[in-house]
Amino acid sequence: MANYTAADIKTLREKSGAGMLDVKKALDEADGDAEKALEIIRVKGLKGVAKREGRSASEGLVAVKVTDAHDVAGQVGTMVELNAETDFVAKNATFVGLAERVLDAAVASAARDADALLAADAGGETVAEIVDGAAATLGEKLVLRRVARLDGEHVGVYLHRTSKDLPPQVGVMVATDAAAASVAEEIAMHVAAYSPAYLTREDVPEQLVADERRIAEETARNEGKPEQALTKIVEGRLNGFFKDQVLVDQAFARDPKKTVGQVVAETGGTLTGFARFRVGA
């Protein structure tokens, strides 16, 4: 019988994310050598990659890093979302470590989409290869879902845990000029809570605005509103849409009497961009 202890089983489970029975079988096969056992788990896991492709990976984490810009004055924010099948794996040290490596590769490569990041170098392997390797070790489908890169004179970030036992599930980056840097983090917290879709009204697609206007008018007519009041009613409802979807028009979470745009204007600065990820959304 292979020579290993309960502590060895516990350590290997934490490293691999594999079940107790699989860990014991691997240790037996490796004659108690933990490193060989980990390799056995990984090899067996690779054989199951194809079987896992059809599974859903809706758990995971969001990771963010802000670095100084090299070519211009200011900062660069980089954010990634990495998905797994279960929250058990999402909080596993191997998975969290993988996310850190993926994030570092995203920063180094300046990738702006998942395909570019998957092809990027991650210490001698591509990001795709280290994700597949971790999937084999952990025995779950892992997916690099998306990456965002945001440039600004200042980039404020906020990470939110939906459960204290899990890594961050919501991540936000907010870019401002230097004058508005003092409110960037508070606005990032606001974005996490209120999930705006657009920065300004000008960013809303014209067709979407036209559709909202048409729906508002049809609804008002169906409600029997007087013809002479339709224009005012439609504009009011369209403004309601903007207040719900546009960041600078939203009531500020910390002081609802002001809009986010007003809070930024009071600093004399400008809000230049934002990105928000929520795991699985």
Swiss-Prot record:
SUPFAM superfamilies: Elongation factor Ts (EF-Ts), dimerisation domain (SSF54713), UBA-like (SSF46934). InterPro entries: EF-Ts_dimer_sf, Transl_elong_EFTs/EF1B, Transl_elong_EFTs/EF1B_dimer, Transl_elong_Ts_CS, UBA-like_sf. Gene3D superfamilies: 1.10.286.20, DNA helicase RuvA subunit, C-terminal domain, Elongation factor Ts, dimerisation domain. Coiled coil: none annotated. Keywords: Cytoplasm, Elongation factor, Protein biosynthesis. NCBIfam families: tsf. Associates with the EF-Tu.GDP complex and induces the exchange of GDP to GTP. It remains bound to the aminoacyl-tRNA.EF-Tu.GTP complex up to the GTP hydrolysis stage on the ribosome. This is Elongation factor Ts. It comes from Beutenbergia cavernae (strain ATCC BAA-8 / DSM 12333 / CCUG 43141 / JCM 11478 / NBRC 16432 / NCIMB 13614 / HKI 0122). The gene is tsf.
